[in-house]
Amino acid sequence: MKTILALSLLAAPAFADCPAGTDYSSQIATVVERMQAAPHEGAARVLSAQMWDIWLDAPDELAQAMLDAGTASIQMGDRMVATSHLEELVAYCPDYAEGYNQRAFASFLQGKYDDALVDLDAAIALQPVHLGALTGKALTLIELGRAADAQ
């Protein structure tokens, strides 16, 4: 019985649907506008942190747990485990840009630049002003020897 319960919990993401999540587009647009008018770098950094708070807010608790596990694994240097968690997140929430961005980061750290680029393009398609994904794409293109494309 315990085995069945454990297997059902592991399979939950395969049977669940990720909710649409909160539409933060107006808040992001406001933060971008304020960043462009920031009087100095310090003010822009505060606003950048606000954007990260928005992007790191997953659509539901399950997605948040997957994201948190992935980012914690990245921080601990276990990039393969991070990739596994983030693959689950992307499969569960294919419309959540930060899942792709974090998986791209894990790929980048493993030197898998082509994989990172695919995920960064997906994140940018979902969230065109995702500064983390845009910056990550530029850095990835540089690593691929495509510095001219990074500009």
Tell me what each language-model feature is:
Residues 88-89, 122-123:
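Canonical positions in the second alpha-helix
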